[in-house]
C-alpha cells in the first residue's frame, strides 16, 4: 500500500495560517501505508517554529514518522514507526523544504536530484532504494513545477534518471505532485 501527499509545509492558509502537521501525522498513520511519498516537507522553518506553539522540533519528516499515541489506541497495539529519507530542494534564510519518503522498510540509500527548471521554483526528485522482504524497490518522490514547459523538461529528467540509476527489471514506484491538473504530460 502506498500514498502520496503534498503537505504544503504543514500549514494551511495565508492570512491566518493554521498548523496542520499534527492532523496530517494522524491521517498518514491511519492510512497504514508501507510507503508514503511527501512533497513540501519542512526540514527547518525558524519563523514557523517561533510562531506556532506546537511546531515539531526536528524536521517534519521525522515528526510524521513517529506514531501518534491516539492511533496506537485505535489499533489496539503499537503501530510501526517509519524509516525516513529527506531531500532538500528549496533553501532560504529561515529554513528549507523538500521531498520525503516514509517507509515501513529500511531505506538502503537515497539520492536527491535537483530538477529545478528556473530560479523561482526549486524542485527535486528524491530516489530511494527500499529493502523489503520481497527484495529491493526503487521509490522516487517527485515534485514538478507549475509551468507546463517546466513539467515537460522535469519529466524528461525523471525518465533519464530512471534509465541511468534503476537497473532494468527492478521494481520501481514513482509518485508525487506532478502539478498536471489538465493531464497533459501523458
Model-derived segments and spans:
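N-terminal, active-site-proximal structural segment of metallo-dependent hydrolase catalytic domains
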Residues: 1-79, 91-93, 157
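Active-site metal-binding loops of divalent metal-dependent hydrolases
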Residues: 6-7, 41, 142-144, 171, ...
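Surface-exposed cleft-lining segments at the edges of enzyme active sites
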Residues: 9-14, 47, 111-116, 141-149
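Metal-dependent phosphoesterases centered on the DNase I-like endonuclease/exonuclease/phosphatase
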Residues: 35, 147-186
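Conserved beta strand-loop-helix elements of the APE1-like EEP
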Residues: 66-70, 94-109
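Short, solvent-exposed loop/turn elements at beta->coil junctions and helix N-caps
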Residues: 87-92, 115-117
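Solvent-exposed loop/turn segments connecting transmembrane beta-strands
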Residues: 93-94, 118-122, 148-150
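Active-site catalytic loop in hydrolytic enzyme cores
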Residues: 105-137
